[in-house]
Amino acid sequence: EILIGLVGSEMCIRDRIKSVWLTPHIMEDIPNTTAHLRDRFAELQAAYTGGVQLHLAAENMLDNLFEERLGKNDLLPLGENGDHLLVETSYFSPPMGLKNILLRIKSKGYHPVLAHPERYAYMDESDYRQLKDMGVKFQINLPSIAGMYGNRIKKKAMFLMREQAIAYIGTDIHSYSIFQKFICTSVTRNVQKLLDL
């Protein structure tokens, strides 16, 4: 299904997407190991014949497992230099000491990238500005721009786009049917604007 999605992405936004970072979840409920994810990624690379360059990273829930792996530097970072770390929180409440956790990530030499901040019910525009001033980068999800998660989340995503606060764009692909419905249809115009920034 991931392979189909990658082919679909090439068809939908041809010549604009040059590389894709695959970011499986790591959290206490899904305790993927770096070794397991690297093995599965090697299998994917062996099977994929498309023209998009593939990379492996992870989306890390800021929980106790993350704290443990951060301490051991057992991580799968983003970026050509391997110095960006994709992190997420609960949609409804931040972990205790969120800003301190983000500062610890920075102290380890990583740039924290907050996944889908537009979807966090506890965050608003002032929070985004504070985090940006701290050096936190943002990744928004394409379905948010398409309105898949509702108008409030779409407005927050569009605010982040207008502020040019976006470092990465995520597809949030968990199934090909979602990809077809939202990524290849209603999101295209807004994505084009974002890519042209």
Which role fits each region the language model picked out?
Residues K137-G147:
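His/Asp/Glu-enriched short active-site or ligand-binding loop at hydrolase and phosphoryl-transfer sites
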Residues E1-G8, I13:
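Single conserved hydrophobic/aromatic residue that forms the stacking wall/gate
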Residues I183-L197:
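Mid-to-C-terminal alpha-helical segments outside catalytic/metal-binding sites
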Residues P31-F138:
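Extended substrate/RNA-proximal surfaces in nucleic-acid metabolism proteins
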Residues I166-K181:
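Short acidic/histidine-rich active-site segments
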Residues P24, H116, D172:
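Conserved, mostly hydrophobic/aromatic
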Residues H25-P31, I178-F179:
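A short acidic, helix-capping loop that chelates divalent metal ions and anchors anionic groups
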Residues K18-S19, A167:
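Short acidic/polar active-site loop segments enriched in Thr and Asp
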